[in-house]
Swiss-Prot record:
It is a multi-pass membrane protein. The lineage of its organism: Eukaryota, Fungi, Dikarya, Ascomycota, Pezizomycotina. One of its GO terms (biological process) is autophagy. Belongs to the ATG22 family. CDD domains: MFS_Atg22_like (cd17483). Signal peptide: none annotated. This is Autophagy-related protein 22-1. Vacuolar effluxer which mediate the efflux of amino acids resulting from autophagic degradation. The release of autophagic amino acids allows the maintenance of protein synthesis and viability during nitrogen starvation. It comes from Penicillium rubens (strain ATCC 28089 / DSM 1075 / NRRL 1951 / Wisconsin 54-1255) (Penicillium chrysogenum). Keywords: Amino-acid transport, Autophagy, Glycoprotein, Membrane, Transmembrane, Transmembrane helix, Transport, Vacuole. Residues 572-592 are annotated as: Disordered. Glycans are attached at residue 213. GO terms for cellular component: vacuolar membrane. The chain crosses the membrane at residues 31-51, 108-128, 143-163, 167-187, 271-291, 301-321, 364-384, 398-418, 433-453, 468-490, 502-524, 534-554.
Length: 592
């Protein structure tokens, strides 16, 4: 059986083997355009500020635990037994503010952090529970649309949340962030499917004549004629020797190389398109915050606009994306399973099986360990930098918003340019990620230069507000590369047919890690009274993933992934990929 026949043969009943269309790719890009604004504009800028501001409007100064932080309300009496002084009718714009929750004192800034941590926990549970339904049957697209609409509506509802019910704002933040994370896991699970059925890969599996090139998106050559691989596009999976012309077909290793490059290209375009949308809405949001009064209402209005953007642009994405069903999940009687309880049980059992078989996926384990630390560093640097700029460089909200715009513009440039940079310097995918890590390391190291007296005397080492702008550009450039390359690189290590489950693990690793970094930075700040000493921790956190990435072997990881996928599907190791025997079941039956 030829490779072409293998690719076109359905792997299970209902398998959609149609080539990926431009309309389908447009739908995938469109959802990135729709939802990326939430994580960039809402989570990265205005949602934490809104939560803190609403809590501040109901809080009191930490210094005396009585003076209101806002002039719009009179606080209740302190809890019994408190030694706080009698209420004084004055308002302070500065100082630390606290709220009382279940009798405990909570800093208004911590309120947003606790909300985010709780949303990460809920998000992890939801992602794991729905991964079975996303991998099997026709639920992948349906779940993406449901989570998108619920999350966008929850974001729009901030318009009616007033400081008096700021806890409702926390609940809406948990719902919206959870739905965003779940929907993006589902979106990521489409990526390997779109790549697998892309027309350029189907063409590449046929014999390539010496005068013809197989081209990828926008006419860029993916590889030269058979036996003469384009050395500017060599990556981890490219064989040392060109494919045998006598074999009459492209080698499997070359196909892996093409898949990796195509996946990286599509992922980069998706990230870049999402950043472009985020830049546009971020500029609009800054104008709204500057023009509209009072400040709390302007922030809520911005969140409404973010939710509206997410909602509106999800509609064309829902129309253009194909369902792309996964293999049916069977009950103990061999019939398709329709119970949501059964799907959830299966999802958690699958996670357990995946963890127990982790020793067979050595490269995924190494990569996820590196990604755990790296994603924690990404999230922690972002939050720490904003807090540092506000508290120690005394930068105003408009200036902080401008930093975010610069970060996004650099991110767009990075998402589109890193593939060309890696080709120019002949870098493999893993080497490109390592280059991004090295550049990322420069940010905390530059902050640590501020401890050196000679550097302090010339006003460098993050002692002046203008220094935040070039560092923001560097951060955005690195993020554009890491976001696209890490996502597509991980996709090549996933067992075929289990995209949603493994991308759920990717998302859990990504989001779950961000609980620890901010907490440690907070503890260091409490210990030393300033944020700068935390740059030592950040430098270590960013450096450790570098040697781990050097250990990842994409060829070995791909082989292990295919072997594990065959084992999970119950396919004999000697059978041809894509063939369906009469007595083959797609999954181990489970009790409903």
């Amino acid at each position: 059986m030829s490779i072409q026949e293998n690719v076109e043969s359905p792997q299970y009943p209902g398998d959609d083997t149609r080539p990926t269309s431009k309309r389908e790719l447009a739908g995938w890009y469109c959802y990135g355009w729709a939802a990326e604004v939430f994580v960039v504009c809402a989570m990265g800028s205005f949602l934490p500020i809104t939560l803190e501001q609403m809590a501040r409007d109901r809080g009191v100064l930490l210094s005396d635990k009585t003076t209101p932080c806002s002039a719009t309300w009179r606080p209740p009496l302190p809890p019994p037994g408190s030694d706080a002084p009698v209420y004084l009718p004055q308002v302070s714009d500065g100082g630390q503010c606290i709220i009382y929750f279940l009798g405990a004192e909570i800093n208004t800034a911590s309120f947003a952090l606790y909300t985010f941590s709780l949303s990460v926990l809920v998000q992890a549970v939801i992602i794991i529970s729905m991964s079975g339904a996303a991998d099997h049957g026709t639920y992948r697209k349906k779940l993406l649309i449901v989570f998108a609409f619920i999350g966008s509506i929850a974001t729009m509802l901030f318009l009616v949340v007033v400081p008096k019910v700021y806890l409702l704002g926390g609940l809406l933040a948990i719902i919206s962030n959870t739905c965003f994370g779940a929907s993006f896991v589902l979106l990521n699970s489409f990526l390997p499917v779109l790549v697998r059925h892309h027309p350029s890969l189907k063409e590449s599996e046929e014999v390539a004549s010496p005068d013809d090139n197989v081209t990828g998106p926008r006419g860029d050559p993916l590889f030269s004629s058979t036996g003469d691989i384009d050395r500017t596009n060599v990556d981890d999976s490219t064989p040392l020797l060109g494919p045998n012309r006598e074999a009459g077909k492209t080698s499997a290793a070359t196909i892996t190389s093409l898949e990796l490059r195509l996946s990286t290209r599509i992922s980069s375009y998706g990230i870049g398109i999402g950043y472009i949308g985020a830049v546009i809405l971020q500029v609009i949001s800054i104008l709204v915050v500057v023009v509209v009064r009072p400040p709390t209402f302007s922030l809520r209005l911005v969140l409404f606009l973010i939710g509206l953007w997410w909602f509106v642009f999800t509609i064309p994405a829902s129309l253009w994306l194909r369902t792309r069903p996964g293999p049916p999940l069977l009950d103990s009687g061999g019939k398709p399973l329709h119970s949501w309880t059964g799907y959830m049980v299966y999802a958690w059992k699958s996670l357990g099986k995946t963890v127990t078989r982790a020793r067979q996926l050595k490269d995924i384990v190494i990569f996820l360990a590196a990604w755990f630390l790296l994603s924690d560093g990404i999230a922690t640097v972002s939050g720490t930098a904003v807090l540092f700029a506000k508290t120690q460089l005394n930068m105003k909200p408009a200036a902080l918003g401008l930093i975010n715009v610069i970060v996004m513009l650099a991110g767009v440039f990075g998402a589109f340019s890193w593939s060309y940079i890696s080709n120019f310097f002949n870098l493999r995918a893993s080497q490109t990620i390592i280059a991004c890590i090295i550049l990322f390391e420069l940010i905390p190291l530059y902050g640590l230069l501020g401890f050196i007296p000679a550097v302090q005397r010339v006003g460098l080492g993050l002692h002046q507000p203008w220094e935040m702008y070039p560092l923001g550009a560097l951060y955005g450039l690195v993020m554009g590369g890491l976001s696209s390359y890490c996502r597509s690189f991980f996709g090549q290590l996933i067992p075929p047919g289990y995209e949603a489950a493994f991308y759920a693990l990717y998302a859990i690793t990504d989001k779950g890690s961000s609980i620890f970094g901010p907490a440690i930075v907070g503890a260091i700040t409490d210990r030393y009274g300033e944020i700068r000493p935390a740059f030592v921790f950040l430098a270590v956190l960013i450096f450790v993933p570098l040697p781990l990435m050097l250990l990842v072997d994409v060829d070995r990881g791909k082989r292990d992934a295919v072997a594990l996928g065959a084992e999970l599907d119950g396919i004999p190791q000697g059978s041809e990929y894509g063939a369906i025997s009469d007595d083959q079941t797609t999954e181990d039956p489970i009790e409903e």
